[in-house]
A protein has these predicted regions:
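Non-ligating segments of multi-cofactor redox enzymes
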Residues: 1-210
Length: 210
């Protein structure tokens, strides 16, 4: 995924779309937007930075998982098998991006009972185990099965990218040189979070420093 920080307006529509799609409980944001100050006075700039699981090529969360619940697909998406996860939270400690959550008891937006929308998407298997952004892998897989192209067809693209009003989030195949994400990285200046850690994130940021 590529986030264009030159375009992001900090509206957090991506956060809302993610919460609606995945029915994450209060306090859990698989996709959130940071309000960041860059530079030093008087040359200060403000930017908004979408963050979440970086779907690293060398994920430290997977390395420390004692139950092998954390895995990685061939397309690079880092996954969690809720049936195998023992809830030790080693992965949450190892993640340098603070992208993992653990919810011990069911929580809902308005009281003890879920709303109609929450009830449709509530997954009891996520209680007491690690959870995080999945890049809407179920949606991606369903789209691929129908011959759709992730990052091009909305029904094969993560909810956050579909919802972005500024077209700041772009999803696609990094191994395809003709994909939308590959072209963005070729034509623009980009960086990744905590490159120095060697995790090789699959989430890229475009930023033209003024």
């Amino acid at each position: 995924m590529v986030a264009d920080l030159n375009r992001c307006v900090g509206c957090q529509t991506c956060t809302a779309a993610c919460k609606h799609t995945n029915a994450t409980p209060p306090g859990v944001q698989w996709r959130k937007v940071l309000d960041v100050e860059m530079g030093e006075y008087p040359n200060v700039e403000r930017l908004f930075m979408p963050v979440g699981c970086q779907h690293c090529s060398d994920p430290p969360c997977m390395e420390v998982c004692p139950s092998t619940a954390t895995g990685q697909r061939k397309d690079g998406i880092v996954t969690i098998d809720y049936d195998i996860c023992i809830g030790c939270s080693y992965c949450a400690v190892a993640c340098p991006y603070q992208a993992r959550y653990k919810v011990e008891t069911p929580r809902f937006a308005y009281g003890e009972q879920p709303t109609e929308t929450e009830a449709l998407r509530f997954d009891e298997g996520r209680i007491g185990v690690a959870q995080k952004c999945t890049f809407c892998s179920d949606r991606v897989d369903a789209g691929l099965a129908r011959g759709l192209k992730p990052g091009v067809d909305p029904d094969a693209t993560p909810a956050c990218a579909n919802a972005c009003i500024a077209n700041a989030l772009t999803f696609g195949d990094l191994e395809d040189p003709d994909s939308n994400v590959s072209k963005l990285l070729t034509d623009n200046t980009w960086f990744r979070m905590h490159e120095e850690l060697g995790t090789e994130p699959g989430f890229f940021y475009l930023w033209n420093e003024k």
